[in-house]
Swiss-Prot record:
Topology versus the membrane: Peripheral membrane protein
Species for this entry: Pseudomonas savastanoi pv. phaseolicola (strain 1448A / Race 6) (Pseudomonas syringae pv. phaseolicola (strain 1448A / Race 6))
Enzyme class at the top of the EC tree: translocase
Function of the molecule: Part of the ABC transporter complex PstSACB involved in phosphate import. Responsible for energy coupling to the transport system.
Disulfide-bonded cysteines: none
Coiled-coil residues: none
BP-aspect Gene Ontology terms: phosphate ion transmembrane transport
Positions that bind ATP: 63-70
Stored SMART domains: AAA
GO annotations of cellular component type: plasma membrane
Entry protein name: Phosphate import ATP-binding protein PstB 2
Length: 277
């Protein structure tokens, strides 16, 4: 009996998509993008994106400004729904389930797929109330449960020792780096499965950046992490896999060491060596 290859009968576009995706067993894929196009009104922002995001690894998106990195990231928890005129063609599967299915509970999706933005955005509340905010929304108000969640989340975010004696002080009194780690604590307090980080260190000093990078390394044992960064050195330091994007297209995707030391595409090499971008 003849066995056809997985690519038999594919057109060239589909074949290119197949080759870009990592060959991972189903149980090791957190997010599968089999072929995504995204539009803002009449303008197409993402073109035929296909990739698999590995579970409990750090995947970074790199590329010049405006290449679609953040747009792709925000599609993973449907933040783009908030932009007028945004529509997609295709699917994004979170552990095998298409998150763009009609009737999808978007609030629950955003609990499962948490997001940390470029600029730290603590609420004008106490440190304690920042961490428990999402839990209270879920109807959890028992003090013992909240206390345990605060300690656990702040320890996981490497912030507990710095703030444990000031939990009932305003979060706005923290440094920028502390605020960003607090936001991460707030995000993981509701026990997501995926963390999306949109340039989380761009507003931080080098010491704070190092602490956040160390935190990312610690968190990947429990969470799937996807990070957008303009800092290629940061991508090389913290990520297991890297995707290079240009003008809304996925140029190359693979393990970080290989992509940075032996890229398959000249366009990737030109970008990481500073020839453009």
């Amino acid at each position: 009996m003849q066995h056809e290859s997985p690519t038999h009968g594919m057109n060239m576009s589909a074949l290119r998509r197949h080759k870009q995706r990592l060959d991972l067993a189903d149980e090791t894929v957190a997010i599968e993008v089999p072929g995504l196009n995204l539009f803002y009104g009449d303008k197409q922002a993402l073109f035929d994106i296909a990739l698999n995001i590995p579970k409990q690894k750090v995947t970074s998106f790199i590329g010049p400004s405006g290449c679609g990195k953040s747009t792709l990231l925000r599609s993973f928890n449907r933040m783009n729904d908030l932009v007028d005129g945004c529509r997609i063609e295709g699917a994004i599967n979170l552990y095998g389930h298409n998150i763009y299915t009609k009737g999808e509970e978007v609030a629950e999706l955003r609990r499962r797929v948490g997001m940390v933005f470029q600029k730290p955005n603590p609420f004008p509340k106490t440190i304690y109330e920042n961490v428990v905010y999402g839990l209270r929304i879920q109807g959890i108000n028992k003090k013992r449960v909240l206390d345990e969640a605060v300690e656990w989340a702040l320890k996981a975010a490497a912030l507990w020792d710095e703030v444990k004696d000031r939990l009932h002080e305003s979060a706005l009194g923290l440094s920028g780096g502390q605020q960003q780690r607090l936001v991460i604590a707030r995000t993981i307090a509701v026990e997501p499965e995926v963390l999306l980080l949109d340039e989380p260190c761009s507003a931080l000093d080098p010491i704070s950046t190092l602490k956040v990078e160390e935190l990312i390394y610690e968190l990947k044992s429990k969470y799937t992490i996807v990070i957008v960064t303009h800092n290629m050195q940061q991508a090389a330091r913290v990520s297991d896999y890297t995707a290079f994007m240009y003008m809304g297209k996925l140029v190359e995707f693979g393990d970080t060491d290989t992509l940075f030391t032996n890229p398959a595409k000249k366009q990737t090499e030109d970008y990481i060596t500073g020839r453009y971008g």
